[in-house]
Amino acid sequence: PPSADGIVWEQLWEDFDEIYADTDAYPFIETVNAGVYDEDNFIRFYLLLNTTISGEEAAEYATEVIKGFNDLIWEQNHDYARSTEDSYGGYVSRYNIYVMVGPDDVKDNRETWILEDTIPAGEYRPVSPGGEEETSAES
């Protein structure tokens, strides 16, 4: 049954995993995990790899995953806007976004992570390999 926000979470997590942990589409991915944490207003994404990819590839994949997560919610509840080129979409934009991309086999060692980024609620910028420091240089 749908939750108070009109979302069948069990279905959403199944679809999310089926799409973004598909090794035919994304041969580098080992597992995708995400969680919505209302208590501190975060959605956290943990994208674990079976091989090394570049920071740019990791950032593009992470941006795609975040938008895709929102759009899976949009498919269930059109009250939330779909993602666009310059928005993560209506559901995700209400939350701070945390994302990390790193190798699964050494995920506990933060130094091995390819990317770690936090994007404040309501703000849009693509995920960046250098986190928020890198984006201010672009103008």
Region roles according to the model:
Residues 1-13:
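N-terminal presequence-like segments and adjacent domain-start helices
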Residues 10-17, 59, 63:
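Generic detector of well-ordered alpha-helical segments enriched in charged/polar residues
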Residues 16, 20-27, 36, 65-73, ...:
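Sec/Tat-exported extracytoplasmic proteins
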Residues 20-52:
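Short edge beta-strands and adjacent turn/loop segments
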Residues 22, 78-139:
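Polar/charged, Gly/Pro-rich intrinsically disordered segments
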Residues 43-95:
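Mature extracytoplasmic domains of secretory-pathway proteins
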